[in-house]
Amino acid sequence: MQVVEIFKELCKFKSITPDDDGALNYIAVELSEFEAFFIEKEGVKNLLLTKKFSDDGEHLAFGGHVDVVPAGEGWSNDPFEPLDKDGFIYARGAQDMKSGVAAFMCAVKEVENFKGRISLILTSDEEGEAKFGTLEVLKFMKEKDILPDFAVVAEPTCDKKFGDSIKVGRRGSINAKLLIKGKQGHVAYPQKCINPVHNFASALKFLAGFDLDPGDEAFAPSKIVITDIRGGMEVCNVTPNDLKLMFNVRNSPQTSLEDVKAYVEKTCEGLDYELSINQSSKPFLTQSDSKIVQKLNESVQKITQVVPELNTKGGTSDARYFAEFGVKVVEFGVCNDRIHAIDERVSIEELEKLYLVFKDLLENFN
């Protein structure tokens, strides 16, 4: 099947983020019937491929990235020379996410009749900072007045078996640094010190693992997760001058940045502290009755005979940028059991079925 050959070619590009290593040029040539726009920002290369099939109808986009994380040591094969073995293809980016890119490339190549417009949005800046990739392409599309109505981001979403998960949203991400101030001194004279560890100890239980909301059927609770805590100089006779704490909240729409800040301020009332807090991504949800959710759900069940769970689990992805521009977006791809791992691999059967899912979606979308 052509999707396997295109996938193998994509895996040969040593496209370690943010370098596409020529992968985007290869894709543009393969899909030469689409109008191509190369969009570069801060050394990041992006590609928009778009084709209008009719003046009426809707605009459906596929999104993905060609960049991969570094391979590291310990592989059984050269991670950029795909190995076909026992029904799997081993390569860096096999699951995350050159399989998804190859699948929608082949699906759109075969479209003859579509009511509306089809676009492909590709970047080499997703695994890194992700600041100058998909976001820049969407800005460009807005300027050209060709923002899509719907989008499918082909990230590896499936858990136990192919077809079991469609992402219909994502939690946001809030990062914070908390500094509890004290006064350094000798442990033998605690009355002359201000020990920030002692002062903060009673407040810690109200932060560590605390749920800021109860969650709902779409989102898990917005939980405070402490990622680092330290104070002192690793000696036993000096009290620390301050206590540093870092935490993250993967927040649902029920809890905002302002809510997190207010809760921390209330918890730290009476302490001498500094709080630095920012939101790196916002939560979003595409409703289950949206056309893109329903159509993709139908195609997944038809091809895989599996009923997918519609969920918002996992970390952030470029899908959040589509949502910021008002695009109804979902995510669907192969299983994710070996993403970013040594000997990353994808099942050939999953790859071929993913192509068939996208092909069926396009054929039955209008």
Curated annotation (Swiss-Prot):
Keywords: Amino-acid biosynthesis, Cobalt, Diaminopimelate biosynthesis, Hydrolase, Lysine biosynthesis, Metal-binding, Zinc. Its EC number is 3.5.1.18. Zn(2+) 1 binds at residues 65, 96, 155. Binds 2 Zn(2+) or Co(2+) ions per subunit. Belongs to the peptidase M20A family. DapE subfamily. Catalyzes the hydrolysis of N-succinyl-L,L-diaminopimelic acid (SDAP), forming succinate and LL-2,6-diaminopimelate (DAP), an intermediate involved in the bacterial biosynthesis of lysine and meso-diaminopimelic acid, an essential component of bacterial cell walls. This is Succinyl-diaminopimelate desuccinylase. It comes from Campylobacter lari (strain RM2100 / D67 / ATCC BAA-1060). The gene is dapE.
